[in-house]
Amino acid sequence: MSDLKETWNRHASDVIANNLAGLMGDFTPAGMAKAMALGSNPLSATSFEIIDLGNNEVEITYVGNARRTIWSKWEQVGDKWQIADLAERP
């Protein structure tokens, strides 16, 4: 099983690289629905910052021309971590 913090770093890197194939396995069905809602305003970033909030929750701030922060709650599904809930933070 992947370490959760390693998974967060890989996930954020995949977001920046627009690696959709890598991202697809990162979401539970409920998490995917919320990600699709955020997808109407795509991210454009060159770097990211991660804040571990504890309890399998994280805020990832994507930095580009602007900054966007996405909160997510991760859960272990089988042998991998997936996003069960997410929201954009101001």
Where are these regions (language model features)?
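Surface-exposed beta-strand edges and flanking loops
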Residues: 52, 62, 85-88
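Intrinsically disordered, low-complexity regions enriched in Ser/Pro/Gly/Gln/His and often acidic
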Residues: 1, 20, 64-67, 73-75
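Generic alpha-helical hydrophobic packing signal
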Residues: 36-37, 61-62, 70-72
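Short beta-strand edge/turn micro-motifs at domain boundaries
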Residues: 67-90
